[in-house]
Amino acid sequence: MKLLKNNIYINVYLKNKQEIFEFVFKKFKEDGAVLDSFLPAIVERDKAASVAIGNYLFLPHPVYDEIANIQKEKMVFIGLKDVINIDGQPIKFICGLALKGEHQMDALQSLAIAFSDPEEVEKLVKDKDLTQDKVLEFLAKHN
């Protein structure tokens, strides 16, 4: 599953988990990708184990049982206007996943690899002119 340019949002002002979950859900729901049960499923997944994985990345994705209810696979990437703190981690980037089976595992692995180099991630964090194209280049370069 490839991240599409029109699913990348830059300089978004969100200040906490709930706002992030609602924004991600709204973007998926607008496209008919998920059912209403998706929002509580991503909240539940985060309660089981934080989806703030370090290196400025937050990865909302549903509990396993919700995957069968995904109507259309989709990814969204959000670059926050400001770094916020979630579960003791600084967060600047969010990648919401509405993916099934292997696609979800592949995306999680690819994102973990892309965000594994602290120096490269720091460059992305400090980029004041971040664009959708730069995000796509960053992800492609590191996978």
Swiss-Prot record:
Active site residues per record: 61
Single GO MF annotation: protein-phosphocysteine-sugar phosphotransferase activity
Main location, first listed in the record: cytoplasm
UniProt modified residues of type Phosphohistidine: 61
Coiled-coil stretches: none
Family annotation (Pfam families): PTS_EIIA_2 (PF00359)
Alphabetized UniProt keyword annotations: Cytoplasm, Kinase, Phosphoprotein, Phosphotransferase system, Sugar transport, Transferase, Transport
Alphabetized InterPro entries for the sequence: PTrfase/Anion_transptr, PTS_EIIA_type-2_dom, Sugar_PTS
Keyword Cytoplasm: yes
Gene Ontology BP annotations: phosphoenolpyruvate-dependent sugar phosphotransferase system
A GO cellular component annotation in the UniProt record: plasma membrane
Cell compartments where the protein resides: Cytoplasm
Domain PTS EIIA type-2 intervals: 1-142
Record function comment: The phosphoenolpyruvate-dependent sugar phosphotransferase system (sugar PTS), a major carbohydrate active transport system, catalyzes the phosphorylation of incoming sugar substrates concomitantly with their translocation across the cell membrane. The enzyme II CmtAB PTS system is involved in D-mannitol transport.
Domain description: The PTS EIIA type-2 domain is phosphorylated by phospho-HPr on a histidyl residue. Then, it transfers the phosphoryl group to the PTS EIIB type-2 domain.
Name of this protein: Mannitol-specific phosphotransferase enzyme IIA component
Species per Swiss-Prot/TrEMBL record: Mycoplasma pneumoniae (strain ATCC 29342 / M129 / Subtype 1) (Mycoplasmoides pneumoniae)
